[in-house]
From Swiss-Prot:
It is a multi-pass membrane protein; Peripheral membrane protein. Ca(2+) 3 binds at D406, D408, D410. Residues 15-24 have a biased composition (Polar residues). Residues 135-313 form the SMP-LTD domain. Ca(2+) 2 binds at D345, D357, D404, D406. The modification N-acetylmethionine is found at M1. This is Extended synaptotagmin-1. Residues 1-47, 617-641, 813-833, 924-950 are annotated as: Disordered. Residues 1018-1025 are annotated as: Required for phosphatidylinositol 4,5-bisphosphate-dependent location at the cell membrane. It comes from Pongo abelii (Sumatran orangutan). Pfam families: C2, SMP_LBD. It is found in: Endoplasmic reticulum membrane; Cell membrane.
Amino acid sequence: MERSPGEGPSPSPTDQPSAPSDPTGQPPAAHAKPDPGSGGQPAGPGAAGEALAVLTSFGKRLLVLIPVYLAGAVGLSVGFVLFGLALYLGWRRVRDEKERSLRAARQLLDDEEQLTAKTLYMSHRELPAWVSFPDVEKAEWLNKIVAQVWPFLGQYMEKLLAETVAPAVRGSNPHLQTFTFTRVELGEKPLRIIGVKVHPGQRKEQILLDLNISYVGDVQIDVEVKKYFCKAGVKGMQLHGVLRVILEPLIGDLPIVGAVSMFFIRRPTLDINWTGMTNLLDIPGLSSLSDTMIMDSIAAFLVLPNRLLVPLVPDLQDVAQLRSPLPRGIIRIHLLAARGLTSKDKYVKGLIEGKSDPYALVRLGTQTFCSRVIDEELNPQWGETYEVMVHEVPGQEIEVEVFDKDPDKDDFLGRMKLDVGKVLQAGVLDDWFPLQGGQGQVHLRLEWLSLLSDAEKLEQVLQWNQGVSSRPEPPSAAILVVYLDRAQDLPLKKGNKEPNPMVQLSIQDVTQESKAVYSTNCPVWEEAFRFFLQDPQSQELDVQVKDDSRALTLGALTLPLARLLTAPELILDQWFQLSSSGPNSRLYMKLVMRILYLDSSEICFPTVPGCPGAWDVDSENPQRGSSVDAPPRPCHTTPDSQFGTEHVLRIHVLEAQDLIAKDRFLGGLVKGKSDPYVKLKLAGRSFRSHVVREDLNPRWNEVFEVIVTSVPGQELEVEVFDKDLDKDDFLGRCKVSLTTVLNSGFLDEWLTLEDVPSGRLHLRLERLTPRPTAAELEEVLQVNSLIQTQKSAELAAALLSIYMERAEDLPLRKGTKHPSPYATLTVGDTSHKTKTVSQTSAPVWDESASFLIRKPHTENLELQVRGEGTGVLGSLSLPLSELLVADQLCLDRWFTLNSGQGQVLLRAQLGILVSQHSGVEAHSHSYSHSSSSLSEEPELSGGPPHVTSSAPELRQRLTHVDSSLEAPAGPLGQVKLTVWYYSEERKLVSIVHGCRALRQNGRDPPDPYVSLLLLPDKNRGTKRKTSQKKRTLSPEFNERFEWELPLDEAQRRKLDVSVKSNPSFMSRERELLGKVQLDLAETDLSQGVARWYDLMDDKDKGSS
């Protein structure tokens, strides 16, 4: 049977191949059978698609050639074709960059953690510039709420645009009568809040929140003007920035918050992906212009000083002031100079390197200033001054960018940023700041001007400003804030038409305009305007109310600002009658003036004679205040409020009980004890006691001291270990809150050891607060000698606080190069090194250090200023005895370095550590003769000892005894002793303080020492002696000796004290200068009082 040519072969059922398994999991029905009419050849699934793709590609290339053909047809040159090609390539590049940035941002939000780890090594072009890791609290709970609400917010936006915005656009212009929104979708990517940071408000009635917001959305909004077949839209958007939300005022009624203010502290980052006709906005040049215009529109109502206010309660007072509050202060920025800038100009195709033509842009929020251009200079001197209003601290930043001026495009030379909070804290900040993104430094002097609400210091400010060299504008003495509220009964236009009033406010040559309010003669503006005033006594505010055409004047007002100077708190809040207007036309305004005052308490002005660093002033033209040409040098330091607020914590590690036995002998068959010691950690310091051998109830009786601050959350960590040859065994730990000790001042407790079955530790903690008076120093030294333990370091009697602010006129390296100086402060064996300030002979350190002082009369502060790699630039030795005679024990001034070149400004402040719970009384209570006030229980009965008297009583006894010590000494002189019984260690303690008026037998003074013997024993076990002093009749020893014996046995002994001298190097004989014998049974061992004892003669010469 013949087949027609159109028929294909008919395969038999056995010849038909089985359907292959679909790897994609599609059902068998998806595989279509061949069409009988297809000639027997099954069409491939992508055949039609491939053909369509080829045709589309061919069509695109043909469309590209059409403009070329048309250009040739109309006789245009090839330059037009090349220009169009360049325009297209630029547009394509901008589009690709936007799409790549949008994809990277979306992918980052989809898998934030994993992608961040991968993109750490990406180039800066691939990783979005806004990606940061702010030190804020996460707010995932808030993001979940936003994600849930996002679809409903999209529905609201669709209704808002279709029902409100679209009719308004159609009514605004006859050509837009067919304007409509064809598509409104917010997409599936909601706004994300990266973190929230809460700041303490300036007032108690406000709460400040910073929201780090990031929106990388797939929003799609399309519009169409059907009459002109015009389509446009947005497909994708990025918005990143810090939105500050202020809840203010807080009220006593629901909803608790009266209003919410929102604004961006700095301009946010915005990137829009256009579609349709708005694709033209991605053309290079138009792209940056359109982005700038959009950002300017956003900044006009949502970037400082503008803010969005949402009242939450009706009839809220001072809405205008909430919408535009007074500035926190004014910063006067002196842009002085720059140095070491990069050379950007090239000549002869780059073969010859030129210099740069630098200028600077200074920004704070929306306030921007541009300096003049300095031609061909890498170390320009500008000497310009700008004044900016600061609205939010912290948050706002001063930004300075330096550019090289070129005919085509200016080259970037570097930038610096500084938080205004540092200027507020310093008051005056004068420094060289390094430029980031380039090289070199810029010299700024920043002055924080406070706002005063009275005119008392206006004359002083005006006098200061006369000496300020300021350009391009003279310095301001005050600011004026005008709150323009509303007007009433303005005159109508011709034909009794309602006017469209707006207001022009002018002070000298500065004019600002309000918005226009349409079709009303009773407009409400609620706007604020700010002016700088050079001389409020002579300036005037000129107000013109006009129609929006500016041709018709509806009213005028001229107000001398001198009226404000006599008003309460420099405020006028009232109606003002308009002239050249209707009979009842008036304007309601609130005017607030504030005087700009630079706190001069820390600044030396030339009117102060003899101040180091004051200017040389011409008597005919005295300069007052701060000057760019001759900036004042401070006479005193300006430390922060935390300087000098440290305390000293004295830690007595007394004893422990019931510790765990860790030692084992004979392979663990024999159980031993432990060799315990204590480790303490606090404020970054660690201490360790001595080891007590084989004792489960050890006594350490050691004292440690550490400098602490009142920062909350600190803890004293105590751990007990058993000392072993290999690894020390853990015996327990405990913690004590430092805040508890600082608040109570004293803590004496048995603390249970944690993480072990048994054991407890006895600690005594005492807070010592420095006092700026030397009257109690001798008593403090006396008390310290009484409570000093043999195995502890000498106790501190004072705390020295040093604030190193700055240095000036340091010597240069090799005569021409600036050093990189740092300072080292040393007292005894403790040192502190400041930071290194790069390449300057006038470094500013602003650092503080504290030292424990044991002997203020004899110790010195050693200061060395060194250069990194250059050695010593200068040194200073300050005896602390000078502080003891200074007012408030403080020296705050410039000190000249010993090198003769250079000075340092520092503050040295001494505080005497007076103990309120000395511990001497606690030691002595168990054996006082006044039994009526004492506890009968032994000291180790399980609780802390009962303190029966206080340190002031001890000091009173010491003062009383010292007052009677001026009796004349006997013929052989006197020896000063303190004898008492230390009950906690069960020891008899004697302190040999010194001798006076000793006998001189020969031509030369003796070399005295003191020998002590505890009778009736005369063996070496009870014998003690001091060191020997050379050639003196009044030696000072201050040495402590101990004998371990019970109290009842000590009261049966006699203490034999002999003062001897070694007259000859070769002789073993010792000359007895005098002796005294104390019957301890007749001595009050509970008092611990230092006394002078007359030395007696003894015919028998003793030998060592």
